[in-house]
């Protein structure tokens, strides 16, 4: 039986490179010994695992980012606290194109990003392959905004995603460049149910579209649905968008674009891209995930189209707090497999490695991700399952006790749990294993030239939104003009000898019939609305709330049910409390939100 042992320091110093500020390759710092820093510059992906406050960011990910920037490789990172940006941007400013998207302070964000613009450019391209990319991006945005939630009816979110997708195609077909933004989608949703001529605005719009229109294919299910079903779909769709549209600063940031993802390249100048998100709530995690997904897909496509499958300058991606944003990067398992050969390396930062990956991606996909990891930094964690896994990976050693050879773990789960701050077990490709204490990043690298990053806003123009009502009016007018021109042409082509001496129709009689029909349709709509209100109303009883999240709950209920925040707060102060919802979808959304925030609610039959 083989007796395992830790890797000797001499083996590390012999087989790994030194990070001295002049190195032309980069990687995570794996050992600091006798004033010398050693790093791993292989293609292997990296995972950093450990509970909060153990030094994952200060000792590992920040040092990795600095080493990457000094070696003039490219860097992309999701930065929940803004630490990476604050600590490393001054280095990036020297040789890199620096892009910073700040979801914490959207009005002050140095850069702006329009999640629809890249797809729009592909959609309007003459290259048929680009149309496929556009469709894929639109679908990914839709399913990130409306994900399928386990143990709930998938119909509503899938229908809402289809509705959003149809509106996006409609915007691409009918809007101009400056109108392509999320604010336009929100305005289109608001206007879609406007009553007109006994119908509603979106149904009229769809009626003008050709049968092979992508917009019509996705919207016809919505426009032909019964009133109560349509109202519920609309409620679910608008509710997910409201978390963005309620912030004017955020909507402004998402309506401009200084990033221009489709034209990013790393050949002439490396890039340093920082995506800053709040660490005290997860409202913008979805957007950060979409942004990261668009970036990675672009660079993989760029490697394929321009560089024979491998980028000339390595891109290093740091995903801090992956458990939060991971759901919006649904393609991560495939990315882990595809990235390595494209010269893209990822570092995943988690608090409970395997269990968080399984929670976000499922067991099979989590196994794919773990199989792609070559370098592991294991700090102390609260998960005994994870600690036992690391203990088993290190292996057993043989010892002699009273003349007998027995085996015991080289390190136990308890010993791993007891590791102090900044101390980690390092595992590299199942070949090297050792425990080391890391200094803070500013002890590893000289930070004497540090200064705060430049935060100048690069965009000054205002965005405009698409007006669905005006578009429908123009399409109606165009249809009338074409009909009149056709009638006029037909009349001119007819020989006067054979023309009838009486009018083809009585204009006043026709107008009277049209008015009567409109009145009938409006009466039908009124009856349908009355029936919908009487049969569709639901009541939700809230019996318990999480007092630490009352403010969040007040905002949500106020927006969902259009009740003043003051009245909501008064109601919540005397539990149990009943709220009346206009649709089953609203009721289900409210119940799910209350439970998700630690409360209890149920539908009142």
PLM features: what roles do these ranges have?
Residues 45, 387, 554:
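Generic structural marker for isolated residues within well-ordered, non-membrane alpha-helices
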Residues 336-429:
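Conserved ATP-driven motor cores of ASCE-family P-loop NTPases powering translocation/secretion/packaging/pilus
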Residues 73-78, 98-102, 345-350, 376-380, ...:
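Short hydrophobic alpha-helical runs that function as membrane-insertion/retention elements
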Residues 84-86, 387, 550, 587:
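Short, well-ordered alpha-helical microsegments
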Residues 498-605:
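Short, amphipathic alpha-helical interaction segments embedded in low-complexity terminal/linker regions
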Residues 2-6, 10, 19-23, 29, ...:
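P-loop NTPase motor domains
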Residues 434-440:
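Short amphipathic beta-strand/extended segments with alternating polar/hydrophobic composition
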